[in-house]
């Protein structure tokens, strides 16, 4: 099986623990005042409405930075999303490119643990994408800790990277499964290891 093919499936219990992913009003996030080396994509957050729409929701967050107002249902059809989730980061890239004129590409992190070179590549890709007001959509599996020590764990999930600080040592994640805490900061190496075995669209 292609290593970047992973389903987005949250258990009902997992969704409840995540605060219930109910799509409420979209929240616009304009770029705040930035420090040196800080960049934010001008995105609009929207939670996923069910346990299997993390792919469409993350793609929608990314497309909002382009000023695209696309429904999650429309994206789900294009992505082939079912109750088993969205198959692949390749599908995310394909659909993002339909709306952006080909700005996205898929990158794999094939190893179980990201190598220093793969971390450096992710860091460079996040910088280039966010500088271009293009959020990164990551396909993750398992658990990772944010900078506050809070663990986030999924049996397969998509989320969006919308901001970085400094030399891209820490990144801000917009997580469509967490409307109660829609964003959190994570070390870029931790994120790379969360993606490991899968891929991302940047």
List the model feature ranges, each with a label.
Residues 1-95, 142, 149-150, 165-168:
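Active-site-adjacent structural segments surrounding the nucleophilic cysteine of cysteine proteases
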Residues 74-202:
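Conserved active-site-adjacent core of cysteine acyl-enzyme catalytic domains
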């Amino acid at each position: 099986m292609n290593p970047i093919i992973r389903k987005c499936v949250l258990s009902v219990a997992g969704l409840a623990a995540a605060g219930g992913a109910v799509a409420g009003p979209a929240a616009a996030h304009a770029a705040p005042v930035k420090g040196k080396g800080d960049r934010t994509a001008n995105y609009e957050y929207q939670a996923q409405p069910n346990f299997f729409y993390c792919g469409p929701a993350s793609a929608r967050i990314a497309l909002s930075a382009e000023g695209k107002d696309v429904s999650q249902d429309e994206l789900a059809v294009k992505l082939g999303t079912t109750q088993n989730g969205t198959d692949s980061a390749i599908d995310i890239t394909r659909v993002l490119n339909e709306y952006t004129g080909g700005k996205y590409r898929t990158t794999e992190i094939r190893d179980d643990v990201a190598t220093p070179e793969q971390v450096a590549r992710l860091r460079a890709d996040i910088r280039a994408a966010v500088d271009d007001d293009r959020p990164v959509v990551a396909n993750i599996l398992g658990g990772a800790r944010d900078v506050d020590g809070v663990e986030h764990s999924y049996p397969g999930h998509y989320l969006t990277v919308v901001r970085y600080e400094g030399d891209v040592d820490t990144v801000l994640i917009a997580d469509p499964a967490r409307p109660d805490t829609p964003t959190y900061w994570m070390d870029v190496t931790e994120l790379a290891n969360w993606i490991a075995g899968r891929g991302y669209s940047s």
